[in-house]
From Swiss-Prot:
This is tRNA (carboxymethyluridine(34)-5-O)-methyltransferase. It comes from the Eukaryota. Its EC number is 2.1.1.229. Residues 200-229 have a biased composition (Basic and acidic residues). Present with 2360 molecules/cell in log phase SD medium. One of its GO terms (biological process) is tRNA modification. It comes from Saccharomyces cerevisiae (strain ATCC 204508 / S288c) (Baker's yeast). Required for the methylation of the wobble bases at position 34 in tRNA. Appears to have a role in stress-response. Residues 172-236 are annotated as: Disordered. Coiled coil: none annotated. The lineage of its organism: Eukaryota, Fungi, Dikarya, Ascomycota, Saccharomycotina. It is an enzyme of class 2 (transferase).
């Protein structure tokens, strides 16, 4: 896949989607994972680091004794993070083009982010780019979705396709009213009766029956129109995000390919993780 094709794929199925689902996504991301928490809490006091793909910033306040700059490609998620805590150090930035000075930080984390790049070359490159911001010996904790998720509700397992599009279902909500007004449905009407052939004594009763039938017909049409509008307005909206599902050992291979030493690795919450150390 050419670079332009890969970037277009990521724009359509990653960047665009996260901006569209940002508020709902943020509501589901609030509890830090144990190993990430442990990594952050064991950084020496006064350490400075970066969270690449910080989302709503749930890891930025885990350890008050360290300093973290959070970045994300989604300005929608950065806005969510600012809403949660205005004191967070945040910026909008692509993980392949971070604005930080090289060899500046003591550590980095990138949680459930690298798997969104759509080729191996780009995934290795983003790991290399993150490492370039660390001082020699600095460590980066990287998490990616695992292929081996047989015990989870997602059901991914060894032998399945590794490059997948994962649905995100937005809750049912009233859709915005259509900008173009649609003409109201025509009420089915019966022609007004010709009273010329009706005996004078029966005309009043005959006309009253016609009015009642006309009203019943209008009520049925109004009800049908309302049901149709409700069905159009209340619907689930599904967005699809691109993921590369990492098989066991693959993330460590990518980190080594990026020039890092693998300090430690493991599995947590359907993710493979690696602590990559800059040589």
């Amino acid at each position: 896949m050419e670079i332009n094709q890969a970037a277009e794929k990521e724009q359509e199925y990653v960047h665009k989607v996260y901006n569209e689902i940002a508020p709902h996504f943020s509501q589901t991301r609030y509890k830090p994972w144990p190993i990430v928490t442990q990594f952050l809490k064991t950084r020496p006091m006064g350490s400075i680091g970066i969270d690449v793909g910080c989302g709503n910033g749930k890891y930025l306040g885990v350890n008050p004794d360290i300093y973290i700059i959070g970045s994300d490609r989604s300005d929608g998620l950065i806005e969510c993070a600012r809403g949660i805590n205005p004191s967070y150090n945040l910026l909008v930035a692509d993980g392949l083009n971070l604005p930080h000075k090289n060899e500046t930080f003591d550590f980095a984390i990138s949680i459930a982010v690298v798997h969104h790049w759509s080729t191996r070359e780009r995934r290795v490159e983003v790991i290399r780019h993150v490492l370039s911001k660390l001082r020699q010996g600095g460590q980066a904790l990287i998490y990616c979705w695992a292929l081996e998720q047989g015990s989870s509700r997602r059901g991914y397992h060894e032998g399945m396709e590794q490059d997948v599009f994962v649905p995100w279902v937005l809750p049912k909500s009233k859709s915005k009213p259509k900008t173009k007004s649609t003409p109201p449905a025509k009420v089915k009407t019966r022609p007004k009766p010709n009273l010329m052939n009706i005996p004078p004594k029966e005309r009043s009763e005959y006309l009253q029956r016609w009015k009642e039938e006309q009203q019943r017909s209008k009520s049925l049409d109004d009800n049908d129109e309302k049901q149709q509008q409700d069905q159009e307005q209340e619907r689930e909206e599904v967005k699809y995000r691109y993921y590369h599902l990492y098989r066991e050992g693959e993330l460590a291979e990518d980190c080594r390919q990026a020039g890092a030493a693998v300090h430690s690795e493991g599995f947590e919450r359907d993710n493979w993780w690696v602590v990559a150390q800059k040589r």
